[in-house]
Amino acid sequence: MAVNRYMHNPLKYFKLHPDVKTPKFATEGSACFDLHAFIPDGTEVVTYDTWGDYRKVEVNKKLSLTKGTRALIPTGLIFDIDEGWSVRLHSRSGLALRAGLVLANAEGVIDSDYVEPVFVMMINVGDRHQTLSNGDRICQGEKIMSYYYGLEEVNEKPLKKADRDGGFGSTGAK
């Protein structure tokens, strides 16, 4: 008998509009669920250009992103995340590879105490204008158990733990 893995401690969500696309796993083996852009006619989207200048752009089911433009893409969802959990947002590999559209903050983190509309912070790192349409899959979400830990200041510099110097490639390429 098959076990429905999706019903164990489900992630609850609220749709701000009936036309918001339901987040879902693309396949039985998908580790993450897909989130969609919710940009119907008249939606205002917050953007920042390459100079960091803020603008609100009214869109009509499509949003054009020029090279270097960052945008807060609405999903039309509010998550109800259980205490002790968070949702992590990741770029979609195909969108990143083919269109150069990635999460501007590398990974989005939605804490359990955030109960406001979810936006996806995207940037066009490609050389061409890219267009997002209402309903497009824009990122992947993953519900993660939070591990709580304290922070403790120490009075002595930590000792070297391995034979390496520095970071950023310090262990070599091969």
Question: Where are the predicted features?
Answer:
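DUTPase catalytic domain/fold
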Residues: 1-174
